[in-house]
Structure formats: structure tokens, C-alpha cells
Amino acid sequence: MEHTYQYAWIIPFVPLPVPMLIGVGLLLFPTATKNLRRVWAFHSVLLLSIVMIFSIDLSIQQINSSSIYQYVWSWVINNDFSLELGYLIDPLTSIMLILITTVGIMVLIYSDSYMSHDQGYLRFFAYMSFFSTSMLGLVTSSNLIQIYIFWELVGMCSYLLIGFWFTRPLAANACQKAFVTNRIGDLGLLLGILGFYWITGSFEFRDLFQIVTNLIYNNEVNLVFLTICAVLLFAGAVAKSAQFPLHVWLPDAMEGPTPISALIHAATMVAAGIFLVARLLPLFIVIPYILNLISFIGIITLLLGATLALAQKDIKRSLAYSTMSQLGYMMLALGMGSYRSALFHLITHAYPKALLFLGSGSVIHSMETVVGYSPDKSQNMVLMGGLTKHVPITKTAFFLGTLSLCGIPPLACFWSKDEILNDSWLYSPIFAIIACSTAGLTAFYMFRIYLLTFEGHLNVHFQNYSGKKNISFYSISLWGKGGLKTVNKNFCLLTLLTTNNESASFFSNKTYRIDENIRKMTRPFMTITHFGNKNTYSYPYESDNTMLLPLLVLVLFTLFVGAIGIPFNQEGMDLDILSKWLSPSINLLHQDLNNSMDWYEFVKDAIFSVSIAYFGIVIASFLYKPVYSSLQNLDLINSFVKTGPNRIFWDKIINVIYDWSYNRGYIDAFYATSLTGGIRGLAELTNFFDRRVIDGITNGVGVMSFFVGEGIRYLGGGRISSYLFLYLSYVSIFLLIYYFLNL
């Protein structure tokens, strides 16, 4: 075992040769390097697979031995200061290593096909491999300085990947927004690290925990300053994990390629913030009010993310807000001190979310064959629908990922989310009510995404429908955007609500019109042969096997990964692998490791949480599933939506909710007005002060000198006798004044 741990330092550097060799190859041998691009993709997958095997071996040893291994090299700079570099292998590290490598391999395999026709194929794989290196270095770091170095590298890689298609203004703006927003958190992280070094004199985690605990116990430290430093550390996690109020970069990050979205949202960048809080949890526990702040930020984020996902039209942005909400659950669990629940949800959420993003990429890929390369159209759920018969494998995988995120047993997220909900009742009933309500919202918006994407008819082909048997009824939608329409009985309600009629659209105040030449569009930034004018398709088609294989593997993880945390410890049967895995870290937190639960208590709690999820699913199915065809012989819809004052009032309320959700809670607009506008106003004021005051003084002195010189030049005639006469005259005047003043 010791022999294996000794070589763990190599883990972050295994994927590093790929970006280095690609960079050197493109610089020295560009043609040959581009011709061998599939070879570089193979090596990217191969090297990350080696890291995965190594990580699995380390994890097995962690489970069997319940030990923590740390190795440190000391770099002595002088007698007063030495910098220690090393690596730390504990349960948290091994969990993150497996998440990063397994999800990363699936994304790399998927990307080989998804990015195959992109001119930046090699650049993409270089960025991805360096991203993996940065994240692996982050999770194996043994001190705060190493964490900060790799933290910044992760931020740099995310900037490059979000702005991968930098020629698109939206992508360029999105990567800048992510970069600037994360700089705010990174500044807090740096100040917090320096503050704790000033207090403790060490960057090492163990020294930090012990010294701070002793200082607080002996009342030898200023608690206010200590709390401020802890809040600054937490600010770094808030920005990186897209927690309120620094969450605004996450939806815009969807401008990058879809495989990047899967990697960022499942196992890398957003998980880094959760990892940091989990790593520093022994420190946060002993500092007053920090856990309360963490849980408060978590509960706000999970509710805000769920509500903002309700009205999004872009499939990737909807999933982005879903990620934000689920990260809020993890942060809430950490704030409650539920270390096991938070990491359990981190594991179970990673695979379904990667599955959903890769599934959405498959949907987008198939839609581009119809609408061309236009993210506004290929990612717009208004134009989708009826994809079940066109992409059946993608549909099945996406459906299972949706069920998992909704918390339906026995899929992965059910086990972890149910555990967080149970812990929340013990922590705060108010927080528990919000968390349970958000679970219902999660089921609602996830099934909304699924139904709009796969059920009904392909809306991009729908123009107008006319039939023989028509009836009039008031079209309903969640957002009260309906009107009196003529509808054929044999046509679905959902298709009707997305038509280009005079009344408002199902999703916005303005009708979404489809260009007549939409199928003749080509990619402005990619060259894909079957997307040209010669080979167009009337309907989407299923992705190739290279893209489907990762989906199927992630389906297996989604089905079975929750089994590692099943809390049934009966006589002669110990199924709780996760608690055994996390026992060293839980012992460090001085928490009770006994997590057993009898069947009756578990089933009772599970029925409640699953009932909430099913309630959200039923509401989503009623509003979004094309049920009208099955109710065509009943007049339920017309009787349900009678017009009147109550209906009008309800529509107004729903419109307000819709506008608030669709406009991201007006938070981006507030930041643009207050922060961006304020900084711009300050810049204009500074420019005015610089040009009018500073430059005015400098230029004024020059102008005054010029006029004084000119005046003197005209007074002087060039005769010395005149100068002497003026000099004596002035001296005489001053003498007379002095004489009269002294009388």
C-alpha cells in the first residue's frame, strides 16, 4: 500500500504531455500534427484512463485501510520562512479523483465525434487535458498555496473553454464574464489564505486546523478577524460553485461547446467550490457563524436556481440552473455539518448531470441537421418536441437522467437528496420546507425540459394546421400566454402553443418566427459536410456510436452509483460503503459515524420526498405533455379555463413570475445597472477629473507662464537704463511703504 501512495504525486502530471506536445507540434510541425489529430485524442483518453485505474486502486485501499496519507517536500527559503509542497490522499481526494477521471474520459470520447468537424479540434483536446491536469492537481494539494495555484489554473482553463468559439461575440462575452466574476471570489480566497497564514504561520491543512482550534480554545485570537478571514475563504467557493450572489456567470458559460458544459457542471469547475468547503470544514466548524452563513447561502442558491430554471427556453441554460440548484443542496448539507450527505450528493449528481448535458448535446447535434448551426435555434426547446422516434437512445438516456435528478428511486440522486432532506428537518424546519419545496420544483422543471424536447411533434416543421373538425377553446400555458384559438381535435396541445399565430407564444411575449430558409444555413465557425446545402435533412437523426457509448456508460453509473451509500447496516450485512470510505474524514470532524437506519424509518421518509417529486412531475405533465389528444372526447380543458376576473388576475400573477424567471430574477440587470454602470460612471468621472483638473492645472501653468512672459517681453525695451529705473522705482516704493507702516 505504501508503495502505491509513494507514486501518487504523478497523478496530476499524467495528462500534461498531451497539451504540451500538441502545442509544440502545432508550432514546429503544424501540418503533421493536424493530420494526426485522432492520435492525440486517443492519447488523451489513454492517459486519463491510466489516472482512473490508479485512482480506483487508491480508493480501494482507502476503503480497506481507512487511512490518510500525506507526503511533503520542504523548500527552505530562509531561516524564517519555508514553503512546503506535497500531496494529500484521503477519502475526499480519492472521491474527487474518480469523479474527475470517469466523467472526463466519457466527455473526451464523446468529444471525439462531437468536435470532429471543428477546426479547433486539437486546441479543444489540449485545453481539456490541461483542464484535467489542473483539477487533479487541485484535489491532491496538501496546502492552501498549492490549492490557490491550481485554483487559478482551473479558472484559466474554464476561461479558454467557455470562450472556445471566441469569434462569436456571445462566447467572448461569456468567458470574460466568467473570468471577472471568479476574480472576485479568487481575491477573497487569496486574502483569506494570507489572513490565516498571518494568524497561524502555516499553509498546511493539519497545522491550520490544530492551531486555530487551540487559539480559539485559549481565547488567544480575535474572533472577528478570524471570521472575516473564513468568510473570504468561503467567497472563493461561492464564485467557483456558482452560489448566490456570484452565480451569474454559470448560465452564460453555456456558450462553450456542450462537452465542456458537461465537464464543468459535473466534475470539475463547479465541484471545486464544494471540494474547498469540504476540505476546510474542520476549520469552519470551530469558527462561529460560518456554518450558518454557508447553509444560508446554500438554501438561497437552491431555491433561486430552481425558480430561474422554470421559464428558460435554452435547454443548456435550463440544465445550468439545475446545476446551480443542486450545488445549493450540497452547500446546504455542508453548512448543516452533514459531510457525508454533501459528498454523497456530489457523487450521485455528477453522473446524471453529465448524462443530461451529453444527452442535450446529442439533441443539439441532431437538431443542427435541420436548423443549421445556430445556437438560438438548435438549443431552443420551442423548436423541439417529438424527438422520441428520431433519437430513441438519447431519449431513453435523458429520461433516466431526468428521473434521477427528480429523486425517483432507485436512481442515484434519490439516495443522497433524501438524506439531505432528512438532515434539514433536524437542522431547521424553515430550511427543510424550502428544500422540500425545491425538490418539487426540480421535478417540475426537469420534466418540463424532457417533455418539451421529446414529446409531441417536431415544432420546427409546424407552420399552420387546418382540419375539418375544429373547436374553439382557451389555450392554456403555465405563463398565462393563451388566447382564443381554433384547434383541430387530433392535434396536440403543445404543438398548438408553439405556433406562429397572432397570439403570444408559449414561452415569451413575442412570437418566435422560423426563417423560411432555415434549413439552408451552414456553420459559420465549423465546416460539417452534411450541414451544407447539398445534404439537408427534414428530421433529426440519432447520433453516432462514439457519442452514444458515453451516454450508455453514464446510464449505468446513474442506475447503480447510489448503491455505495445505502444506509442499511443490518446484522451480518454492511452495505454502507460510503461511510466506511469516509470514516477517516468523519473522525477528523468528530462526528458520529453510525449512519444506520431501519427500513420503516427510511421508507417513511422516502415516501414523503418521492411524493413531492411525483407532484412536480404530474403538474409538469399536465401543463406540457400533449394530453389534448387523449382528452379530445372530454371538455375538461374548456371547463377548467373559464375566462373571468379571477382568471385575469391569475394570468397577471403568472406573467410576473414568468418574467422574473425568464429575466434571471433581474439580478443580471441589477448588476449591469449598479455595478457595471457605477464603474463606468466612476471611470467617466475619473476621466473628467484627469482631463479637466489634472491636465487643466498643468496646461494652466503653461498658459500663465506664456502670458507672463509675453507681458514682460512687451514691457522691456532692451535698454539697461530703463531696467535700472524700474528697479529703483520699485525699491523706493517698498521702502516708503515699510517706513509708513513703522511710524
UniProtKB/Swiss-Prot annotation:
- Where does the protein end up? Plastid, Chloroplast thylakoid membrane
The record lists the membrane-crossing segments as 9-29, 40-60, 89-109, 125-145, 147-167, 184-204, 219-239, 258-278, 280-300, 396-416, 425-445, 548-568, 607-627, 723-743
User: Keywords, A to Z?
Assistant: Chloroplast, Membrane, NAD, NADP, Plastid, Plastoquinone, Quinone, Thylakoid, Translocase, Transmembrane, Transmembrane helix, Transport
- Which GO molecular function terms does the record list? NADH dehydrogenase (ubiquinone) activity; quinone binding
Q: Give the matching InterPro entries.
A: NADH_UbQ_OxRdtase_chlpt_su5_C, NADHpl_OxRdtase_5_subgr, ND/Mrp_TM, NU5C-like, Proton_antipo_N
Tell me the enzyme class. translocase
Q: Which family does it belong to?
A: Belongs to the complex I subunit 5 family.
Q: What is this protein called?
A: NAD(P)H-quinone oxidoreductase subunit 5, chloroplastic
